[in-house]
């Protein structure tokens, strides 16, 4: 992985919710101005190739921007590989539990869109599959590690997928199948937004995932021209307008 954005959020989170006993059981909330509120919660799932050293804080600028544009935003933490409760299936269960907590938060709208970046995009698509969260409004996957088989074939980020699963595909085929949204039925409307010049999650990862979809699957994809892996989470980059438009379109289409 290259570098993560270190730009601080101009406005800090309004509150932080603790959802369990581990340091990963937490999410930060940014609220929109009342006159701009859309009645939709966006739950951000950060990337970092499922590794412990990357946390939610690099998505704070995106959280602030989305709140300024009218969304209630929860920036999720979750258990990554090497942490208590992390690895597979723990990482998936951690994200699903955090999203469920956001959905149940009485101060947030019940309509929840999961927006994940990179490894978080993989997790957003995973939650949107196999009827895991029938209450979820939609999923927006930004530069997602969508096909774990292709991620492993390319050896991305020093074989990050094997680090997540804890084994090679031939040694744990059922675990790989459970973790891979490319091998599961999509049951929640989803959008993929990728950067034209993404070297961290190459286009073949997106293409191989899309090749597993049927014409009836509720998904479409868009490419941010000129964007790299991190431009799709940078509110100061032109790609942000595309990301915002896709979130808006998804929430309107599923209303």
Model-inferred region functions:
Residues 199-205:
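Conserved alpha/beta-hydrolase "acid-adjacent" motif
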Residues 116-126:
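Glycine-rich nucleophile elbow surrounding the catalytic serine of serine-hydrolase chemistry
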Residues 207-210, 214-255:
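C-terminal catalytic histidine-bearing segment of alpha/beta-hydrolase fold enzymes
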Residues 1-35:
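N-terminal cap/lid segment of alpha/beta-hydrolase-fold proteins
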Residues 186, 192-194:
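Short beta-strand/loop motif that positions the catalytic acidic residue
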């Amino acid at each position: 992985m290259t570098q993560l954005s270190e730009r601080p959020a101009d406005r800090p989170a309004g509150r932080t919710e603790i959802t369990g006993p581990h340091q990963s059981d937490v999410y930060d909330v940014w609220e929109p101005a009342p006159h701009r509120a859309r009645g939709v919660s966006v739950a951000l799932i950060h990337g970092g190739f499922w590794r412990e050293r990357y946390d939610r804080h690099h998505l704070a600028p995106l959280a602030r921007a989305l709140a300024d544009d009218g969304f209630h935003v929860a920036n999720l933490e979750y258990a990554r590989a090497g942490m208590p409760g992390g690895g597979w299936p723990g990482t998936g269960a951690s994200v699903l539990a955090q999203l469920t907590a956001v959905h149940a938060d009485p101060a947030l709208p019940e309509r929840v869109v999961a927006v994940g970046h990179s490894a978080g995009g993989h997790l957003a698509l995973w939650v949107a599959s196999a009827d895991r969260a029938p209450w979820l409004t939609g999923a927006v996957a930004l530069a997602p590690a969508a096909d774990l088989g292709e991620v492993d074939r390319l050896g991305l980020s020093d074989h990050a997928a094997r680090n997540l699963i804890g084994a090679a595909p031939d040694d744990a085929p059922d675990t790989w199948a459970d973790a891979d949204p490319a091998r599961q039925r999509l049951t929640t409307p989803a959008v993929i937004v990728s950067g034209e010049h993404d070297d961290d999650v190459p286009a073949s990862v997106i293409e191989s995932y899309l090749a597993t979809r049927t014409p009836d699957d509720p998904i479409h994809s868009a490419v941010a021209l000129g964007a790299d892996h991190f431009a799709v989470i940078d509110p100061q980059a032109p790609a942000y307008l595309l990301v915002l438009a896709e979130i808006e379109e998804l929430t309107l289409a599923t209303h």
